[in-house]
Design a protein with these regions (language model features):
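Function-determining surface determinants
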Residues: 1-313
């Protein structure tokens, strides 16, 4: 089996186990959410997203769509459940906000249960998993060198695309979801692919000693397990990223995530009919802070120097 196929099968096996167990639960959606199904789905989606830009676009897009449909549904549950847990201990909120949010948790869980049943995801003989494997069995996988070169080209193209996206908002963000959150999504994929690829991507071994990057190298970032690359293993070729530039990317993703969550809290209060003038002001401040760190980051051109090159073992 080619390395590319092995990477997909790694996550498919995890999902096989989850869907088999979920099939015997009274509330499969809640069980999948509570047992971490979102992570392997996200990794599978990421692999399919990447490979659809490397080869056989149609097959990989189908796999991406299937994984994304479930990952998105779990994401909605996570969104409401996360805030429901926050709101449960916040005595300053207006009456009705917690009840509204808990109701949304129940509704989003019911929606996922319908999807799981209608599309036949559950059980040891999952129809959707069979369809995914059938698609992947038809792929003419690239050899290692061609594959890693294609990944390198994809990173370069994607970085140029992200630069253009960010440049549109040099004068400042005006919208949370389509601007701040979308930028974070684009950046985040660049940090997700290395984990999903299981050793294909490695970081340089030595620090850059670049004073411009020093502010991004916080203990939380440099010590994060998500910033440790899986071992290269049997991969003959790897794509090497500059370590400190990767840390800077990780810092940006983390900070935009913190700001995004602050803005989403205001959005949810508005959805429940309880957004105050102070909440609106807080969202405006989120946009302002997001604009400031984004402009600084892209003016420094750290992302443009993320890719170091190929390594042959």
């Amino acid at each position: 089996m080619k390395h590319g196929a092995e990477r997909f099968e790694f996550y498919l096996k995890k999902l096989d186990d989850l869907f088999t167990q979920a099939g015997s639960q009274s509330d499969p959606a809640a069980w999948l959410y509570q047992n971490g199904a979102r992570t392997p789905l996200f990794m599978l989606e990421g692999l399919a997203r990447l490979y659809s830009n490397l080869q056989d676009k149609k097959s990989f897009e189908k796999v991406e769509q299937k994984a994304k449909s479930l990952e998105d549904a779990l994401g909605v549950i996570d969104y409401y459940d996360g805030f429901a847990k926050q709101f449960a201990t916040d005595k300053t909120l207006p009456d009705g906000v917690l009840t509204f949010t808990q109701k949304r948790v129940a509704e989003s869980t019911a929606t996922l249960n319908e999807l799981l049943k209608d599309k036949e995801w559950l059980g040891a003989d999952s129809k959707q998993m069979r369809k995914i494997r059938k698609r992947l069995d038809e792929v003419d996988w690239l050899d290692d060198k061609k594959e890693v070169k294609a990944i390198e080209h994809y990173y370069s193209d994607e970085i140029k695309s992200i630069d253009k996206f960010a440049a549109k908002y040099e004068s400042g963000f005006t919208e949370l979801e389509s601007q701040v959150h979308e930028l974070r999504r684009k950046l985040r994929w660049l940090s997700i692919f290395p984990q999903a690829l299981q050793g294909v991507v490695q970081l340089t071994d030595t620090p850059s000693n670049d004073p411009v990057l020093a502010k991004y190298l916080t203990p939380e970032i440099t010590g994060s397990p998500f910033n440790k690359m899986p071992p290269a293993g049997t991969n003959e070729y790897t794509l090497v990223l500059n370590r400190d530039n990767f840390y800077a990317l990780s810092w940006m993703i983390a900070q935009l995530g913190i700001l995004k969550d602050q803005g989403l809290r205001s959005d949810l209060l508005g959805e429940s009919g309880h957004e105050s003038d102070a909440d609106k002001a807080a969202e405006a401040d989120v946009l302002k802070q997001s604009s400031a760190i984004t402009n600084t980051y892209f003016k420094e051109q750290s992302l443009d120097h993320l890719v170091n090159g190929l390594r042959h073992y």
